[in-house]
Amino acid sequence: MVSAARGRRPKNLPIDSSVPDDIDWDHIPNHIACVMDGNGRWASRRGLPRTEGHAAGEVALVDAVDGALALGVGWITMYAFSTENWRRPADEVRYLMGFNESLLMRRADELNEKGVRIRFAGRRDWRVPRRVLKRMDESAELTQDNRRCTLTMAFNYGGRAEIVDAVRALVAEGAKADKIDEKAIRRHLYHPDMPDPDLVVRTSGEHRISNYLLWEIAYSELVFPEVLWPDFRREHLYESVLEFQRRERRYGGLES
């Protein structure tokens, strides 16, 4: 278990009265990764098109980032569009492409003002419209010097695809089999400097990984709140962090 000492909130963090009093400031996860699940079910329960669920999820994303900033989390990664999502109906895929483009148009300046660096992880293949790639590049360039928090949007991303791409890059370099180890593969991941997630939060109560950050989450703590993503708020993020703090991370070792 974590230490009974709760630490003190760093003075440089914004004051958020909704942060629980029992948060242990000495054990804040450095990297939180979120699977934003439940948009379709949220919409269906309200008799709305699935696309309305995706639209409603924007507020949840921004509030989760604000919550991460209030805790001093250095990295937060959002599963925005998976390599498997291409199998969804064409109308929904088109909507998601346009939605993510417009989301960046609406939110990039706001996130930049908050000191958030925006990055993207995933394949930049022919299926992703050029206008979307352009907007991604513009957002990344705008925020590249920010260091308060890094928001990585996993877009056209798959954990297996990332590992395959890393191995392909090694082969293309002419790497010999006996020289390929974990360090070599990590150097060829989409963002080698990104620390492994300490905490993975998947909303909607589903207990699955869904091909997300397979290499990086080997020793992550997993939390599965029942709330659907559009209803997710920073209070749910704080509850997930409290659950994380109640656990002892062993990394394959024995209980201390």
Language model region names:
Residues 1-256:
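Flexible, compositionally biased loop and terminal segments
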